Regions:
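Conserved helix-turn-beta segment of the N-terminal RecA-like "Helicase ATP-binding" lobe
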Residues: 163-200
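Conserved motor-coupling elements within RecA-like helicase/translocase cores
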Residues: 188-209, 216-225
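Post-DEXD/H (motif II) to motif III coupling segment of the RecA-like Helicase ATP-binding lobe
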Residues: 222, 226-227, 233-268
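Upstream accessory/linker segments immediately N-terminal to the RecA-like ATPase cores of bacterial MutS
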Residues: 1-98
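Walker B catalytic acidic pair
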Residues: 212-213, 231-232
């Protein structure tokens, strides 16, 4: 293999076309591509080998990041979003009367970013990461209240009935005394109660729906779904998450919550 590589490298009579701009090479002190390829195989010393490795690793990650940015820009142009122009009585009433504690600086910052996204005219696709107990559910609820203030419904999907019930009870308690209809939909809810929930979704009487995979069934339809919150997103398939998009005339805003993000989700 060494003889073969020496033979191949020896055939490089001219420098290879550079794949990075001169400005980028200078800014990051990168080795030219031809030198990097030669020194990765036959380095004159450990320092030269490290520089060659760094150059090739840098280029690979640079183009990965560039493609992610390009995908994000294309996605913003492709998917228009509902414009939530106002923060109204529901949000303000909750903030002034029901907020259980003062928001942390991180929660305030995230809410500000979410409000900006919701009013930008493009579909929000935001990942909300925080440790267990950091207040992600409260941020998600306040985001859903913005949807309600603008005449839209909101839906939260959790991977298990236990977690869905937990969110349901927490949100009902947080909204105590407010005129907001919240319902729970799981596979174990059947009969007249299920029919009443499905009917309320179609009329818009059910403003917030919390549930499991049951919320993506074909029989579940909304009057005006504006925001989807997905908890523990890594436990859902991509196709399962995407099915919620079909529940609205145009794709609803998406807020994904997790304590343990995975690379695939970050790329999305």
């Amino acid at each position: 293999i060494e003889k073969m590589m020496k033979s191949l490298v020896g055939q490089l009579n001219e420098p290879l076309p550079e794949t990075l701009s001169p400005a980028l090479l200078a800014e990051h002190h990168l080795m030219p591509l031809t030198d990097a390829l030669m020194n990765i195989h036959f380095p004159s010393g450990p320092d030269v080998l490290r520089k060659a490795e760094y150059r090739l690793k840098f280029e690979e990650l640079f183009y990965v990041q560039l493609n992610i940015l390009r995908y994000a820009k294309d996605r913003q142009r492709k998917y228009r979003g509902y414009v939530f122009e106002k923060v109204g009585d529901i949000f303000n009433g909750f903030y002034s009367r029901n907020l259980p504690f003062e928001l942390t600086n991180a929660q305030k910052r995230v809410l500000k970013e979410i409000r900006r996204d919701l009013g930008a005219g493009r579909q929000m696709n935001r990942l909300l990461q925080g440790d267990v107990g950091s207040g992600k559910t409260l941020v998600a609820l306040m985001s859903m209240l913005i949807a309600l203030d603008n005449g839209y419904q909101a839906c939260m999907m959790a991977p298990t009935e236990i977690l869905a019930n937990q969110h349901y009870e927490t949100i009902r308690e947080l909204l105590y005394g407010m005129d907001v209809r919240v319902e729970l939909l799981t596979g174990s809810i059947k009969g007249k109660r299920r029919e009443a929930i499905l009917s309320g979704l179609l009329t818009g009487d059910v403003q917030i729906l919390i549930g499991t995979h049951a919320v993506i069934e074909d029989t579940v339809n909304f009057a005006s779904l504006g925001l989807v919150v997905i908890d523990e997103q890594h436990r859902f398939g991509v196709a399962q998450r995407a099915r919620l998009w079909t529940k609205s005339v145009q794709p609803p805003h998406v807020l994904v919550m997790t304590a343990t993000p995975i690379p695939r989700t970050l790329a999305m």
